């Protein structure tokens, strides 16, 4: 659901990575623009995934453990810290702001009374929105339902994400029963954000320091373990000044390919995300501004689809490009032009870069990469002078 959209963006490459990722590593350009660091995993783990790199180089995400559970982590100064859970086995940190406040979702030890598996871990435990501060995990309220999650946090500690209501959505396939809505948390209070038209469900994916929130709304669908989402997002949305703005689309109107969804907004009001193309069979990354509206960012040459996940203050966009076989490459867009990030790294890079999930104001990037042995790890790509 909700935050699992971002997990899809940063983890969807796993199916094709083992077969194709390392073969492509030898094709890098000799031009040096980034030094890549493998941030590794928690002890005993074999997989990690990132979601945000803040302007102090702190990365939020999750790592597997020796028992294959997944725990929220922060990487800081080369050190990985397990943030823990709310008593259950799994958690993910989808966000960290520049003051070090982290947020995400964490399982409790209590079974969901409706048998739902909201966070997709397969445990059917209640999974709550959570903030990690001062070494502890602090749950946030829902909108009357049992589950939710934080996707982003701005500098002032206002969080954006998703939460269930107490109302059932008859369109939701089992095991999901309850509606879920976009939400902002301010001073510990959950504030429901409106969805577009008659859309029953939605989620907030990003928030900037001015309180502008982005996300999407649509209809509940079956949880897809490959896409890690059960929202068919029909409308990409912006919430600002108490007003809902439909950002439009690139021709696709049903959300059946991947959907129309805004993932991030910078402090200049520039929005990035994904939109289905006409016919709703494939999707492209987009950049939206108030002046130019939605623009198609395209793909790497020859690829079939793309997604834009993050944008920094200078307007550099990162995400991924996908070929017809589902293989992915990390992408950076400058001036609307996509470049394979693997062509900009040192030949000694320890990883082939599958996705770019976040970029900070200094241009440092985090995402998923694959090692020579086939493990998928979090990386940090640091710009270097030529």
What does each model-identified segment do?
Residues 2-386:
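Residue-level hotspots at or immediately adjacent to binding/recognition sites across diverse folds
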């Amino acid at each position: 659901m909700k935050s699992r959209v971002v997990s899809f963006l940063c983890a969807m490459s796993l199916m094709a990575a083992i077969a194709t990722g390392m073969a492509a590593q030898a094709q890098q350009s000799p031009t040096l623009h980034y030094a890549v660091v493998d941030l590794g995993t928690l002890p005993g783990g074999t997989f990690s995934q990132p979601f945000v790199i803040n302007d102090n180089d702190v990365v939020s995400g999750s790592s597997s453990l020796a028992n294959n559970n997944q725990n929220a982590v922060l990487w800081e100064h080369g050190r990985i810290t397990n943030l823990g859970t709310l008593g259950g086995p799994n958690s993910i940190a989808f966000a960290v702001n520049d003051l070090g406040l982290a947020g995400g979702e964490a399982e409790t030890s209590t079974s969901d009374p409706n048998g739902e598996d909201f966070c997709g871990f397969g445990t059917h435990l209640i999974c709550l929105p959570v903030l990690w501060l001062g070494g502890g995990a602090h749950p946030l309220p829902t909108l009357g339902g049992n589950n939710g999650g934080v996707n982003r946090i701005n500098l002032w500690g206002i969080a954006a994400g998703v939460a269930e209501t107490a109302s059932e959505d008859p369109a939701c396939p089992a095991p999901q029963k309850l509606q879920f809505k976009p939400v902002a948390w301010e001073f510990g209070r959950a504030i429901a954000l409106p969805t577009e038209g008659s859309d029953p469900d939605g989620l907030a994916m990003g928030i900037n320091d001015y309180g502008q929130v982005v996300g999407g709304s649509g209809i509940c669908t079956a949880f897809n373990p490959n896409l890690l989402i059960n929202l068919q997002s029909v409308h990409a949305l912006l919430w600002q000044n108490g007003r809902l703005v439909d950002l439009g689309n690139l021709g696709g109107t049903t959300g059946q390919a991947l959907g129309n969804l805004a993932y991030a907004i910078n402090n200049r009001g520039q929005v990035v995300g994904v939109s289905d193309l006409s016919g709703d069979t494939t999707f492209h990354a987009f950049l939206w501004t108030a002046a130019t509206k939605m623009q198609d960012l395209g793909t790497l040459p020859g690829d079939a689809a793309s997604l834009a996940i993050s944008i920094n203050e200078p307007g550099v966009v990162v995400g991924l490009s996908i070929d017809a076989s589902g293989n992915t490459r990390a992408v950076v867009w400058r001036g609307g032009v996509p470049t394979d990030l693997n062509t900009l790294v040192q030949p000694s890079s320890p990883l082939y870069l599958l996705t770019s999930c976040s970029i900070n104001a200094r241009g440092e990037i985090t995402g998923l990469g694959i090692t020579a042995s086939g493990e998928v790890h979090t990386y940090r790509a640091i710009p270097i002078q030529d």
